[in-house]
């Protein structure tokens, strides 16, 4: 019996790999997904902070908080992936990162993303984009790119989030900018 368990466990684990890879491919094909790999390659260092929340973990969080905060649980349940990478290093070439961020920003513009924030001040470079459905009732993704001397931050939130969900979240946490969000 022990031998059977020893043989089955690796086989089950190997069998789960295609399922996990298929889930990753679904997220990569989602209109709200942004591939920041070129920027992480340019940084040439490991991120100081790396957050990668995928659907299974997000579903678990949703179930854990549903009884305490229904609005937050509803919001989280619509997310497919949240990725945050923070690089803190004076060795990062801000001009090179900013140039690559401009290329990604141009790509996002061509793909139909809406730029909601653009800052070019001194050596600070910030872009925030929303990927909206055709009727602008659903936000498929949020992309945030920040580069300044010593810090680079990349965020991608992928899901099917209604503007009403964001407004409710803004009310819940007293964030007026989210309550009054108008993406039309």
Q: What is each model feature region?
A:
Residues 1-9:
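Bacterial N-terminal signal peptides that target proteins for export
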Residues 9-18:
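Bacterial N-terminal signal peptides
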Residues 26-103:
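Early exported N-terminus immediately downstream of N-terminal targeting peptides
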Residues 160-184:
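C-terminal partner/receptor-binding element of secreted or periplasmic proteins
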Residues 18-26:
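Sec/Tat signal peptide C-region and signal peptidase I cleavage site
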């Amino acid at each position: 019996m022990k031998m059977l368990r020893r043989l089955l466990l690796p086989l089950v684990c190997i069998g789960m790999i295609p399922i996990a890879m298929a889930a990753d491919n679904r997220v990569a094909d989602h209109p709200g997904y942004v591939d920041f790999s070129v920027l992480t390659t340019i940084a040439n260092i490991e991120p100081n902070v790396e957050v990668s929340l995928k659907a299974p973990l997000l579903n678990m969080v949703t179930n854990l908080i549903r009884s305490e905060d229904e609005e937050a649980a509803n919001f989280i349940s619509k997310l497919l992936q949240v990725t945050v990478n923070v690089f803190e290093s004076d060795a990062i070439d801000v001009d090179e990162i900013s140039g690559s961020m401009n290329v990604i920003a141009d790509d996002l513009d061509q793909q139909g993303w809406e730029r909601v924030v653009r800052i070019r001040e001194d050596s600070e470079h910030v872009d925030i984009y929303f990927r909206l459905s055709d009727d602008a009732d659903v936000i498929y993704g949020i992309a945030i790119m920040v580069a300044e001397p010593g810090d680079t931050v990349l965020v991608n939130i992928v899901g099917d989030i209604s503007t009403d969900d964001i407004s409710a979240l803004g009310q819940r946490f007293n964030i007026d900018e989210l309550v009054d969000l108008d993406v039309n």
